[in-house]
Amino acid sequence: FLDDLRAKLEEAGDNPRTLLNLRKRIAKIRVFDPACGSGNFLVIAYKEMRAIEAEINRRRGEPDRASEIPVTNFRGIELRDFPAEIARLALVIAEYQCDVLYRGQKLALAEFLPLRNENWITCGNALRLDWLSICPPTGTGVKLQAEDLFHTPLDQAQIDFENEGGETYICGNPPYSGGTVQSVEQKEDLEAVFSGRANSWKSLDYVSGWFVKFADFARHVDACGAFVSTKSICQGEQVARLWPIIFQSG
């Protein structure tokens, strides 16, 4: 989708109206990584989108304009507490770095503090959680909110998407784990995903669970998705066991 945005920027040239429409489109895009680790994919997506937005503002003669891309539109799920906090902090830092780069240090510092305490990175098991509650089509999701940036989230709170109605892109690098090396917990995760769908799921790679969860998510949200995965789910015996389930999901 970043390539498409860059192509649209090239097509827009210096046309103010076309550039404005592209900026509005970018501001509504949601990026969701249900295996986000320390947030690398989310940070890259955010920085690349800010670069495109900055070029739009430059061409429109508005170089100091505040960004319209909400960092809370970049959401993730991470199993472990510490990487989840790192992912959230990495996005906060990325926002500050982009503000310094495109608007100057003075304006960036004025808006950087106090640090946000919203927790748009969910710490939990992506194969057990309802993705629609984390990245919902309506724009509001039930989220865990911490008392401060580094505190373990305890209470449920809602965080609105600041710009609703945009495109949703899902990406990630889920754990692979072949069928013969999965832990008991991972087998139970896959059973929760495939229960009622198939009986011959035990030999599937662990990453296959993310594809099925995305297929379920895409039934309710007009979304595009891509995961880094093992080639074995696209060849050999796993193809017949996994892909019919995904295709049947629509």
What is the meaning of each model-derived region?
Residues F1-G250:
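SAM-dependent methyltransferase catalytic region
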